[in-house]
Amino acid sequence: LSAGDNIGASLFASSVAKDQPTIDVLNALGLQASAVGNHEFDRGFDDLSGRVSEASDYPQLGANVYLKGTTTPALPEYALLQAGSLTVGVIGAVTEETPTLVSPNGISGIDFGDPVAAVNRVAAQLTDGDPSNGEADVLVALYHEGAGAGTPDGATLDQELAAGGAFASLVNDTDPKVAAIFTGHTHKEYAWSAPIPGTDRT
């Protein structure tokens, strides 16, 4: 799994070939699903939803990316993966700040919503008992959003949550049905365990 920014801002050998070499490596590694990061939009939404998605053996997930002025998903929201007898629902979302990080011309036809609200909406769908809209035994969230500091910086989860902001929201407000959260975007190293609100699980 990946939390995004697999392409864009890459080494010259990859960027000069529109990151096809990077996509080829990720395909060879067997990447099964990825959230989109802001850099996936560097060449615009049409490039992402067309050339990049067609070349990728894994889905580019963006549950909070919508067609302009609507709540219609512009990208796949989730992937269902098999792990033994379990079906794992993987939900992806990208930072809501993406419009400030990429060229507006390339994303003029889409909107970016609240990532936590989008993940929670899809989590409810995947656990509502209706197999016609997808069902999962285990839920995982991939957020292209992250903590401002990591373990090597001396940060703890409590400190990061006390700082508030987007990271605190995704930890505190993601639906308790989600068993694990993977994050990205901020280029920080950490692996924290936290109580899941309303449950006795971490």
Please place each PLM-identified region on the residue numbering.
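Acidic, metal/ion-coordinating pockets
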Residues: 1-202
